[in-house]
């Protein structure tokens, strides 16, 4: 730029040489001048304030220059639409090895920016990415929100860095410092800010959206998060294993060039927390990764990949066209034995794989390993220069955590199944479909023999039983015990989900010492007679400290050869003393079965009694695996809860009503409480009280629960409970017809995507129609908690 002050400004843009975009054939073929020269007269005719005149002149010059550059095509196409979004991508875990560990690798292509929920659900950025052919970023902020206090942990530093090539590299902590990076102190929030100059693409700053195209044109840069130094608890002399930071990505994506590829929104990202991984290869052969066939990772890849069956020559192997990024966030990455020379690739923490068509070992799936995305698209696997050392071949597979992302979709039209609009957020108490893969029988159990169970409540002298306990008054003794090889979590509509957190307040104890966490529970209630019920409780636990117990064992057997095989099971009277070992980190399914005499109240049943010798038991779903050991790798699916349903009545063996929050308020009640205000006007206090405590709905003429509801209310009030709380409990324990209709309609509308306000309004309207009354529910009068 050369000019005199406030006279003329001349800008010359030289475009010598070939453009970075190979698609601009028109500009290469025409014999025109490749230099753009812009002259702007910046002199102002009128006198103005010196500072203001200078600023306005600079802005005017800038606008004119930008306009001329756009006309000449130097800055690329104009954005058609821009979208700001903040994506929550997960957490940064603690460092358990003391070396450099990768915690996250964030790909910035809009169709790949997803959290690891394991579903095809998407947001506005992914939707726009599937509609436009090009994208770029105006800015990018990576926000790290601390999840621990500054004094809670020590010994670890985190680093956020920019990888402009999105290719796995062998980097030490010093190498990461050579990149554009930000070091973050644990316990403090931080933001890693990037500008357009850091994020520009090869086509005048733009990137291609379709991930089936050349890798260097589509992926864009990536953000990597590493930790260094073992994370230690400041309050305990032990390692800290929780999360350190919550990672959020705030940015503005711009799109241009409409080209709909609807199937790009269906790319999957998920996590497999318990998967056994091995690598194999020999000199001159491709590097192969093996995982169990029943693992969540293998099943997802198999379901989402298209494998050719007719294009391979004899003796050759073909692969799927679908590429997957694999990120190993566990410390076990350093323990994985890999044939040379690609040890650095696996220890670096992430790589790319493709499913090998038709190649399966007994119980495993195989994948070719690729050191870059472009190599995966070109089908150039990593070639080994040697084999695994002999002493390492016999090592057991390493159990690790894999976070995997589907990188491309060969077919870009509409998929077989429509994508889901919205999000499924696991919450405490939510019901999951849990697929359990059974392991080998636990000693003293053996194949083709009876399954041993713990019979009495006492243990041999000097030993203790295993108890699943909430507190000293509410616990159950372990009877059945089964080893679980792997656990896969799904939402109630069978969408893959992350594992929930352990159930708070519930733990596995041996002599008052915690040995395991409980992740999911289930109770099966079978009515034997009107006043006699069989209750089987299932507990899915993960052992935190390995242990062994000695118990008196017995087993179930069929009482006679005649009659219903599901209703004549007995327990052998004689017992056998044996030891049972539980391995640290292992999953186990523990059971307890009891007979309850009398009416069954709602809620979780704590009935700790031993198995009775002369009592017939029914074969319910919780006892199926306790008759004979199931073959290894057998899978069973249970619908389980992640919190304990609270009891609503007092009695022997049940949880008493001694807490302030007996029931968590349901969604409908919570919404109604939220819309109440202190400015509501009632006609009289008496009318308000009469309306508030009217638990007998006169519109429900066929309400069979009326007597029970009134009886429970009177009992609770006589025990000293307030009328408000007693009414609330009674209405929930024995809901009226109107209550049931409201709740059913409300939950159905919420699932379909309606807002809470609209859902509750429609639910009230349906309840009024069913009751035959016209009685305002939320408008014009106070919304009462029903």
From Swiss-Prot:
Quote the Pfam families the UniProt record gives: Astro_capsid_N, Astro_capsid_p
- Core attachment: region residues: 394-423
Q: Where is this region: P2 globular domain?
A: 424-648
Q: Site positions for Cleavage, renumbered to this chain?
A: 313-314, 393-394, 423-424, 648-649, 657-658
Effect on the protein upon substituting residue 432 to Y: In strain: Oxford
Tell me yes or no: is Cytoplasm among this UniProt entry's keywords: no
Cystine pairs annotated here are none
Effect on the protein upon substituting residue 512 to I:
In strain: Oxford
State the UniProt keywords alphabetically: Capsid protein, Clathrin-mediated endocytosis of virus by host, T=3 icosahedral capsid protein, Viral penetration into host cytoplasm, Virion, Virus endocytosis by host, Virus entry into host cell
GO biological process terms on file: clathrin-dependent endocytosis of virus by host cell
Q: Where is this region: Inner core?
A: 71-263
In this chain, composition skew of type Polar residues spans 1-13
InterPro entries with a match to the protein in the record: Astro_capsid_N (IPR004337), Astro_capsid_p (IPR022027), Viral_coat (IPR029053)
Q: Where is this region: Disordered?
A: 1-60, 648-668
**Acidic: annotated span:** 649-786
Q: Name one GO cellular component term.
A: T=3 icosahedral viral capsid
Region described as Basic: 1-70
Can you tell which superkingdom this protein's organism belongs to? Viruses
Q: Where is the composition biased (Basic residues)?
A: 19-29
> What is noted besides the main data?
The sequence shown is that of isolate Newcastle.
Q: Which family does it belong to?
A: Belongs to the astroviridae capsid polyprotein family.
- The protein's name in its UniProt record: Capsid polyprotein VP90
Query: In which organism is this protein found?
Result: Human astrovirus-1
């Amino acid at each position: 730029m050369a000019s005199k002050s406030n006279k003329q400004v001349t800008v010359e843009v030289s475009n010598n040489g070939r453009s970075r975009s190979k698609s601009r054939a028109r500009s290469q073929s025409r014999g025109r001048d490749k230099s753009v020269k812009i002259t702007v007269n910046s002199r102002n005719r009128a006198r103005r304030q010196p500072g203001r005149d200078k600023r306005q002149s600079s802005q005017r010059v800038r606008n004119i220059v930008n306009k001329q550059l756009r006309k000449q095509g130097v800055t690329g196409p104009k954005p058609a639409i821009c979208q700001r979004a903040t994506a929550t991508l997960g957490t940064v875990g603690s460092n358990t090895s003391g070396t450099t560990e990768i915690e996250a690798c964030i790909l910035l292509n809009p169709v790949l920016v997803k959290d690891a929920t394991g579903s095809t659900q998407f947001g506005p950025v992914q939707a726009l990415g599937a509609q436009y052919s090009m994208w770029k970023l105006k800015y990018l902020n990576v926000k790290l929100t601390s999840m621990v206090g500054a004094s809670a942990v020590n010994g670890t530093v985190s680093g956020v860095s920019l990888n402009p090539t999105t290719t796995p590299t062998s980097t030490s902590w010093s190498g990461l410092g050579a990149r554009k990076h930000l070091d973050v102190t644990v316990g403090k929030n931080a933001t890693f800010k990037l500008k357009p100059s850091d994020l520009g693409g090869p086509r005048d700053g733009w990137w291609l959206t379709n991930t089936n195209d050349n890798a260097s044109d589509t992926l864009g840069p990536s953000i990597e998060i590493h930790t260094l130094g073992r994370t230690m608890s400041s309050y305990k002399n032990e390692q800290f294993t929780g999360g350190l930071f919550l990672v959020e990505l705030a940015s503005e994506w711009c799109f241009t060039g409409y080209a709909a590829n609807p199937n790009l929104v269906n790319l999957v990202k998920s996590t497999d927390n318990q998967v056994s991984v091995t690598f194999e290869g020999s000199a001159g052969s491709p590097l192969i990764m093996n995982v169990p066939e029943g693992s969540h990772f293998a099943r997802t890849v198999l379901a989402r990949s298209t494998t050719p069956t007719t294009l391979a020559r004899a003796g050759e192997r073909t692969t799927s066209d679908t590429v997957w990024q694999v990120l190993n966030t566990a410390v076990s990455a350093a323990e994985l034995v890999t044939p040379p020379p690609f040890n650095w690739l696996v220890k670096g923490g992430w790589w790319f794989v493709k499913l090998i068509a038709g190649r399966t070992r007994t119980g495993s799936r195989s994948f070719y390993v690729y050191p870059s995305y472009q190599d995966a698209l070109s089908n150039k696997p990593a070639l080994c220069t040697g084999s695994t050392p002999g002493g390492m071949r016999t090592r057991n597979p390493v159990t690790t955590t894999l976070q995997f992302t589907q990188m491309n979709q060969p077919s870009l039209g509409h998929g077989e199944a429509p994508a889901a609009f919205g999000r499924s957020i696991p919450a405490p108490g939510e019901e999951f479909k849990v697929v359990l893969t059974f392991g080998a029988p636990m000693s003293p159990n053996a194949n083709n023999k009876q399954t041993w169970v713990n019979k009495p409540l006492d243990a041999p002298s000097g030993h203790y039983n295993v108890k699943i306990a909430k507190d000293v008054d509410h616990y159950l003794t372990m009877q059945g015990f089964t080893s679980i090889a792997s656990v896969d979590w799904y939402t109630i509509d069978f969408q893959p989900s992350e594992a929930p957190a352990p159930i708070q307040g519930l733990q596995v104890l041996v002599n008052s010492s915690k040995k395991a966490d409980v992740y999911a529970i289930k109770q099966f209630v079978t009515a034997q007679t009107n006043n006699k019920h069989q209750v089987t409780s299932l507990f899915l636990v993960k052992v935190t400290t390995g242990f062994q117990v000695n118990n008196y064992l017995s087993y179930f057997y069929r009482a006679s050869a005649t009659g219903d095989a599901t209703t004549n099971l007995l327990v052998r009277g004689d017992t056998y003393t044996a030891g049972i070992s539980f391995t640290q980190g292992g999953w186990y399914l523990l059971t307890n079965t009891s007979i309850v005499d009398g009416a069954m109240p709602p809620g979780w049943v704590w009935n700790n009694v031993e198995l009775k010798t002369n009592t017939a038991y029914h074969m319910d779903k919780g006892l199926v695996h306790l008759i004979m050991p199931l073959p290894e790798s057998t899978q069973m699916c249970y619908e389980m809860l992640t919190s304990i349903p609270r009891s609503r009545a007092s009695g022997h063996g049940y949880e008493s009503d001694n807490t302030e929050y007996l029931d968590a308020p349901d969604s409908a009640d919570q919404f109604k409480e939220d819309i109440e205000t202190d400015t509501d006007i009632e006609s009289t206090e008496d009318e308000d009280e009469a309306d508030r405590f009217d638990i007998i709905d006169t519109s429900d003429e066929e309400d069979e629960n009326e007597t029970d509801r009134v009886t429970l209310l009177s009992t609770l009030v006589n025990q000293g409970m307030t009328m408000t709380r007693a009414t609330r409990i009674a209405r929930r324990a024995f809901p009226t017809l109107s209550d049931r209709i409201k709740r059913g309609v409300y939950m159905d509308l919420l699932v379909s995507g309606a807002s809470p306000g609209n859902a509750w309004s429609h639910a009230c309207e349906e309840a009024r129609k069913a009751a035959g009354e016209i009685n305002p529910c939320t408008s014009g009068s106070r919304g009462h908690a029903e």
